[in-house]
């Protein structure tokens, strides 16, 4: 299915537009959908609507929390890289004059873990590992602060099931990947009966000079866009939008498809293969862009890599390795796990393909897994997707990646809390 027909948002009534959104599993509000028309100057394709649905979700754009997050301190003498890429980096120290940094990333996987707890927690760990790895780091540890409902309350059986499966998911993924889970905490309270909190943290280590950035490097026009990992399927489709909604118990079954499917054994091999790409890039003195493929899938990783380097992108969805026949919008935004995107000069791309496809034989680890060239970096500021020879998306790349922001109504909390004063011991 190729999504080339324009959706007549301009001509729809508010009632018709709302119905269309519901029928197509799109969580945009009517005014947001109409905003797309103003941004791109015409009615959008279905693929373009799904792209903005992902990019304007709370999960991807932080449209409600961004104004508040901007008030937090992010700069200090020991901060090598603040919150502008996939992970932050804090100085660890210097050895023989070389500065080392600890790479830190954290996020939550709450809704997926409440709906499908094992897979939700496992893919939370998997995603946060990718965020650290793609900075060029050696991944060294994970952690998991957890919050569950009351195990002795009215929902005790379900709470215990959620808690056990979340812990099993974290353990099962971490053990197979071979990265130790070093820390975490757990609290139980009935306020979490219907929505557990599964926070995941990952740490890595690197030399400052070895940082790989989440954007296309300087003079990258014409560079290859290479994706690596599992073949794209329909798993995790709409995951970012789902993670941004208020969780509805009645809709739990229909939301299961928005939860991604983990493959930690493939991730284990992907990590080791990626370390080899790091080493080869150092030998050849090549600058690359590298980003994990999480929320928004191919669309999000490729658009952000190119946009953040002040480039555009042209992508042929027919070159994406897929495991099933799925429509254009699903190839573009599905959140299939265990995938990455590289921005590579053409002279280095054969090395990437050889390492993943021949040296580590990804296809023998997971059916259909491999590295594929799917497009190129362009000088234009457009994001262009083709499928079966037809254009399914042609929009300003900055419009796709800049997100939206709301100043939400706020009020003072009902209760005031104070941090406890803990006296330091003279001798521990």
For every predicted segment, state its role.
Residues 1-428:
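Glycine/proline-enriched, intrinsically flexible loops and inter-domain linkers
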């Amino acid at each position: 299915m190729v999504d080339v027909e324009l959706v007549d948002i301009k001509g729809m009534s508010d009632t018709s537009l709302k119905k269309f959104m519901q029928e197509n599993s799109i969580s945009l509000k009517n005014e947001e959908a109409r905003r797309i028309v103003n941004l791109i100057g015409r009615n959008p394709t279905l693929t373009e609507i799904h792209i903005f649905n992902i990019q304007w979700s709370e999960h991807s754009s932080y449209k409600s929390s961004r104004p508040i997050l901007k008030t937090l301190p992010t700069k200090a003498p020991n901060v090598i890289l603040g919150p502008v890429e996939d992970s932050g980096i804090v100085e660890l120290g210097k050895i023989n004059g070389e500065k080392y940094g600890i790479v830190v990333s954290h996020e939550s996987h709450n809704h997926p873990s409440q709906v499908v707890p094992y897979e939700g927690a496992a893919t939370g760990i998997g995603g946060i590992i990718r965020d650290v790895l793609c900075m060029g780091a050696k991944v060294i540890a994970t952690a998991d602060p957890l919050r569950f409902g009351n195990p002795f309350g009215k929902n005790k059986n379900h709470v215990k099931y959620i808690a056990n499966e979340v812990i099993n998911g974290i353990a099962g993924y971490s053990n197979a990947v071979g990265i130790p889970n070093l820390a975490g905490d757990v609290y139980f309270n009935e306020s979490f009966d219907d929505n557990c909190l599964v926070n995941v943290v990952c740490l890595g280590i690197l030399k400052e000079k070895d940082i790989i950035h989440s954007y296309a490097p300087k003079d990258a026009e014409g560079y290859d866009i290479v994706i690596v990992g599992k073949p794209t399927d329909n798993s995790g489709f709409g995951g970012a939008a789902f993670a941004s909604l208020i969780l509805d118990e009645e809709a739990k079954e229909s939301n299961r498809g928005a939860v991604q499917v983990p493959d930690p054994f493939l991730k284990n091999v992907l990590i080791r293969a990626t370390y080899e790409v790091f080493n080869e890039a150092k030998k050849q003195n090549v600058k690359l862009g590298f980003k994990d493929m999480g929320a928004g899938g191919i669309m999000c990783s490729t658009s952000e890599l190119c946009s953040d380097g002040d480039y555009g992108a042209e992508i042929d969805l027919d070159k994406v390795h897929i495991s099933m026949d799925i429509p254009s919008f699903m190839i573009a935004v599905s959140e299939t796990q265990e995938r990455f995107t590289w921005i590579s000069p053409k002279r280095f791309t054969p090395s990437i393909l050889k390492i993943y496809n021949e040296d580590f034989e990804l296809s023998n680890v997971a059916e259909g897994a491999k590295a594929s060239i799917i497009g190129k970096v362009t000088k234009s500021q457009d994001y262009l997707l083709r499928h079966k020879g037809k254009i399914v998306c042609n929009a300003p790349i900055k419009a796709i990646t800049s997100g939206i922001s709301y100043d939400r109504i706020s009020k003072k909390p009902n209760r005031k809390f104070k941090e406890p004063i803990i006296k330091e011991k003279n001798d521990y």
